[in-house]
């Protein structure tokens, strides 16, 4: 044991630990989980934290806060790694390397429609729909670009099922040659299925297999004098070969993931390059939060590299075994490489190897990954140095004793009192946190009363935050002195203290740069110079709150108007309105429908159909 004074209870606990695989949770005196780890031998691993040889900065800081330890024994190392990964995602402990929840990264989803599957972007924490998923991708832009490529080459539909069912003629996607119009049966289910199978192979990186099959189908089409189909297949082959050239095809076959990692003070960057069928299919960057900002010892840097790699393995591979490749290539030796190989191979059902410092073609893959890693790190540092300097400028402006870790901003949006919505956006030291944004439908107030709307939104928000103990350091209100005073009254009534309340009011000309800042705690108002870093940060969060509010307001207003338009027709209630919208996909399509088409909707009589038709064709 080291010089840390352990309680008698904890010291006794350490002597009675089992020598079995499992996970351990280290807790502070308030019962908060500080760290979650896995072990092949719980007794050896947990006791190692209290050894004199363990002198790392992070370890000393962690051990000094441990009040108790909880363990869970598992049947195998594989089970331990899975449980560790799930607990880290759920608890987000302070001293673990934290990667963003896998479900918040976007995927490509191919639906399981029996005849004509749809391709779409999918990103949700809800239970996913059935079908095929591909990803995750580094961002929404990458997914959309890939979907457009799939539409151009394979002509897979991307419309919603309700819209698809309602079509009586091809849409614009058919006109611009991105869809084969299965909605009006311009293509048979059998031929559409071939296109879907090709799209799946494309997303799996099996371009050469597709090219061989397309070439054979083109040859058959020519022999049958079907030159129109042959021309379509020729264009597909041409586009696929162009993509192969852009991706850099190499001669080596096989699947591999190339992982390059760099750990810096405060963050780490993981560059994962996906190689399938010998070609670079994807390159994406991940930026986990490291558990300790000071890396002044070589032991800590190496330890964090290992921890980052293991965290990424759990995050990226263990939920989806289909993602595990034949080979994982890294830029640094792995302490537990044999153990990880065994776990991944078990999970996959066949061999997975980990290789360090490869040669030949594989070394070119690693060079590619490392070059992309350097670019990603440089971009991250540049972006976050700007964010940090802006946060520091705002802290100095507000004369705060501590760093600003979290800010929230509220805005109200409505059209002459109609469909009032309040938005709340959240920023932390990394920038915007979209997953924590909230919108509030405002009810029971006088239309157009912004003060009452703001009071209702802030009250609802902070009642929840008090329970979750997640209060912001700075609360920003997009509004004038009246709205800020209302919010101050709400906070006081809820017993919320130690929050800096700041109003951002548009100037007389409503021009950016002329905003008036209202600092309630000091009862003063002032205008910052246009080049102020603090002003730029406030403008950013204010504009984001406004964007989020107006988007939510427009959706609510459109929904309200559709409902009121249909329900103003005698005989159309909520159920029939829903049936009509589901059949036609929207109000505009319903207005274009013929009397005969409206009659086909379940629950709509001929007399009611005539009334609906006449409503749109007076």
UniProtKB/Swiss-Prot annotation:
Keywords of this entry: Cytoplasm, DNA damage, DNA excision, DNA repair, Excision nuclease, SOS response
Q: Return the GO cellular component terms, semicolon-separated.
A: cytoplasm; excinuclease repair complex
Say which species the protein is native to: Legionella pneumophila (strain Lens)
Q: Which SMART domains match?
A: GIYc (SM00465), HhH1 (SM00278)
Function of the protein: The UvrABC repair system catalyzes the recognition and processing of DNA lesions. UvrC both incises the 5' and 3' sides of the lesion. The N-terminal half is responsible for the 3' incision and the C-terminal half is responsible for the 5' incision.
**InterPro entries in UniProt:** GIY-YIG_endonuc, GIY-YIG_endonuc_sf, GIY-YIG_UvrC_Cho, Hlx-hairpin-Hlx_DNA-bd_motif, RuvA_2-like, UVR_dom, UVR_dom_sf, UvrABC_protein_C
Q: How does it assemble?
A: Interacts with UvrB in an incision complex.
Full protein name: UvrABC system protein C
The segment(s) forming the GIY-YIG domain are 19-97
Q: Which family does it belong to?
A: Belongs to the UvrC family.
Gene Ontology molecular function: DNA binding; excinuclease ABC activity
GO BP terms: nucleotide-excision repair; SOS response
Classify the main location: cytoplasm
Question: Which CDD domains does UniProt cross-reference here?
Answer: GIY-YIG_UvrC_Cho
Domain named UVR: which ranges? 208-243
Subcellular location field: Cytoplasm
């Amino acid at each position: 044991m080291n010089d840390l004074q352990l309680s008698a209870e904890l010291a006794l606990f350490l002597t009675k630990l089992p020598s079995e695989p499992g996970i351990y949770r280290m807790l502070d005196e308030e019962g908060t989980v500080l760290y979650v780890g896995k072990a092949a031998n719980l007794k050896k691993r947990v006791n190692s934290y209290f050894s004199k040889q363990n002198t790392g900065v992070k370890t000393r800081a962690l051990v000094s806060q441990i009040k108790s330890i909880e363990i869970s024994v598992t049947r195998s190392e594989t089970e331990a790694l899975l449980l560790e990964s799930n607990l880290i995602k759920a608890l987000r402990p302070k001293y673990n390397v934290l990667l963003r929840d896998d479900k918040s990264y976007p995927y490509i989803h191919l639906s399981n429609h029996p005849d004509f599957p749809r391709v779409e972007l999918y990103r949700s924490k809800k239970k996913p729909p059935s079908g095929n998923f591909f990803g995750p991708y580094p961002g929404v832009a990458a997914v959309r670009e890939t979907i457009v490529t799939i539409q151009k080459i394979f002509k897979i539909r991307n419309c919603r099922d309700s819209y698809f069912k309602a079509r009586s003629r091809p849409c614009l996607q058919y006109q611009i040659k991105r869809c084969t119009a299965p909605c009006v049966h311009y293509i048979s289910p059998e031929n559409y299925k071939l296109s879907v199978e090709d799209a799946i192979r494309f997303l799996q990186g099996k371009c050469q297999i597709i090219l061989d099959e397309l070439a054979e189908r083109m040859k058959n089409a020519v022999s049958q004098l079907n030159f129109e189909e042959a021309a379509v297949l020729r264009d597909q082959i041409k586009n696929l070969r162009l993509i192969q050239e852009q991706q850099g095809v190499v001669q080596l076959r096989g699947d591999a993931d190339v992982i390059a990692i760099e750990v810096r003070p405060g963050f780490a960057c993981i560059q994962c390059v996906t190689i399938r069928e010998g070609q670079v299919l994807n390159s994406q960057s991940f930026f986990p939060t490291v558990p300790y900002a000071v890396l002044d010892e070589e032991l800590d840097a190496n330890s964090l590299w290992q921890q980052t790699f293991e965290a990424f393995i759990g995050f990226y591979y263990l939920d989806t075994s289909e993602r595990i490749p034949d080979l994982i290539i890294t830029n640094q030796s792995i302490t537990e490489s044999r153990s990880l190989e065994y776990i991944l191979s078990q999970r996959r059902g066949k061999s997975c190897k980990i290789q360090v410092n490869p040669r030949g073609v594989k070394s070119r893959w690693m060079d590619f990954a490392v070059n992309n890693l350097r670019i990603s790190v440089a971009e991250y540092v540049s972006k976050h140095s700007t964010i940090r300097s802006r946060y520091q400028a705002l802290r100095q402006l507000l004369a705060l004793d501590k760093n600003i870790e979290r800010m929230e901003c509220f805005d109200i949006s409505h059209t002459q009192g109609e469909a009032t919505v309040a938005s709340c956006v959240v920023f932390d030291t990394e920038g915007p946190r979209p997953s924590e944004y909230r919108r509030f439908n405002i009810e029971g107030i006088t239309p157009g009363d912004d003060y009452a709307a703001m009071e209702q939104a802030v009250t609802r928000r902070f009642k929840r935050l008090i329970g979750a103990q997640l209060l912001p350091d700075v609360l920003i209100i997009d509004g004038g002195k009246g709205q800020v005073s209302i919010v101050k009254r709400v906070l006081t009534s809820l017993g919320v203290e130690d929050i800096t309340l700041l109003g951002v009011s548009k100037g007389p000309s409503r021009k950016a740069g002329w905003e008036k800042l209202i600092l309630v705690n000091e009862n003063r108002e002032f205008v910052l110079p246009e080049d102020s870093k603090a002003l730029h940060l406030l403008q950013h969060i204010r504009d984001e709150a406004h964007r989020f509010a107006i988007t939510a307001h427009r959706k609510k207003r459109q929904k309200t108007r559709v409902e009121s338009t249909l329900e103003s027709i005698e005989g159309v209630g909520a159920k029939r309105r829903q049936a009509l919208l589901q059949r036609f996909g929207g109000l505009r399509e319903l207005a274009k429908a013929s009397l005969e088409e409206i009659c086909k909707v379940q629950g709509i009589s001929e007399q009611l159909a005539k009334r609906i038709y006449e409503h749109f064709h007076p």
